[in-house]
Amino acid sequence: MGKFDRYAFSAQPSFDEAATRKAFSKAIPLKTLVIYCYDPRAAEIPNAVAKLFGDEVFPGDIILDGSGNRVASTTTIFPVIVAGGRAVDALRSITVAQHLFGIQNIVVVHHSHCGATSFTADGIINAYEHEHRVDISKLYDRSNICISDYEASLKHDTALVRSHGGTPKNVNVFGYFYDIDTGTLTEVVRDVRRA
């Protein structure tokens, strides 16, 4: 038995995967997954999405049981924070969120003055090889490495999300540009499959 097994649901003798999954879906009412950049200036993006959508809760409250254990939350937004807010790095999280919670919306947000706009695909590949003596040119699809055109990158990322096998066909997919100075979200892509 591992040192931390008591914290893993699947390591418990009484583990029932179907029952655990059902409990997860009731404990946290997540319905919207928001993919955005790890730039600290972009930290307000989930709040902006919650405000824009109107029926979302973020960050919400943690619910404690009688023993003081953290057993649930009131948040409806699941943040996925990755470099440049690029969707390629969030695909597995989309599949897991759907499996555990049954999501309704996926929102991809790219923000103004993002560090991912400060280099090109060739630039980072060449610099990495020069500085670390490693060729990363085959590790990543060039269209997912940087942002040179916000509208094009949002259209690319939302299409990537929509076409991915781990994305439920009935979820809504949105792409927004976020101005970090004004806090304004501008819709670039709307692919609505459910009301």
Regions found by a protein language model. Name each.
Residues 111-113:
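Short, ordered loop/turn segments at secondary-structure junctions
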Residues 40-79:
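Short, surface-exposed acidic-centric catalytic microdomains
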Residues 78-79, 105-109:
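Short hydrophobic alpha-helical runs that function as membrane-insertion/retention elements
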Residues 1, 65-69, 107:
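Polar low-complexity intrinsically disordered regions
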Residues 1-31, 37-40, 83-92, 96-101, ...:
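Divalent-metal-activated hydrolytic enzyme cores
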Residues 31-32, 77:
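Structural motif
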